[in-house]
């Protein structure tokens, strides 16, 4: 049996962790094995890379940053994601290659096509079965982040124009692949968002079971 790969994407402060937890609870109640993971930081090596790319103070050259994310992705897919999918689990992942295209491609103003190709190479071509894009106005997301008072994060601390480029890049990716993406207004009540995600996930899993 082949598992199901679901990723959650969007800018910082959109509620990915909340929705991942809600979806996990529902899937486990339905009897599925669920593996919850993230990029960067979904493996022991990834935790070390996460500290560098997100929490290290000081400049990191944009191309170096992109390569660090790709290194994390290559190791994570090979050691965590593919083994879980091979045994039939549902993998719920906070961020994947679409984040690299949005943050390093648009945010850092690198070539988005090159970033995507690098990411696909690192992931051995693995694409999600479903990508949930939680979309939220940048100003509203900023309010949530400020209220959360989390530790220093290099990406969260970027200026508003950076985050707006990231948001528009995500929307562009979703528009280019509507069959893979579910775009949800992250300003909606969290239970409404969770219901929309469950509906799409349920249809995806049912289709896989009947294939």
Curated annotation (Swiss-Prot):
Question: InterPro entries this protein is in?
Answer: P-loop_NTPase, Thymidylate_kin-like_dom, Thymidylate_kinase
Source organism superkingdom: Bacteria
Give an example GO biological process: dTDP biosynthetic process
Protein keywords: ATP-binding, Kinase, Nucleotide biosynthesis, Nucleotide-binding, Transferase
- Give the top-level enzyme category: transferase
Its recorded reaction(s) are: dTMP + ATP = dTDP + ADP
Q: What is this protein called?
A: Thymidylate kinase
List the lineage, top down: Bacteria, Bacillati, Actinomycetota, Actinomycetes, Micrococcales
Q: Which gene encodes it?
A: tmk
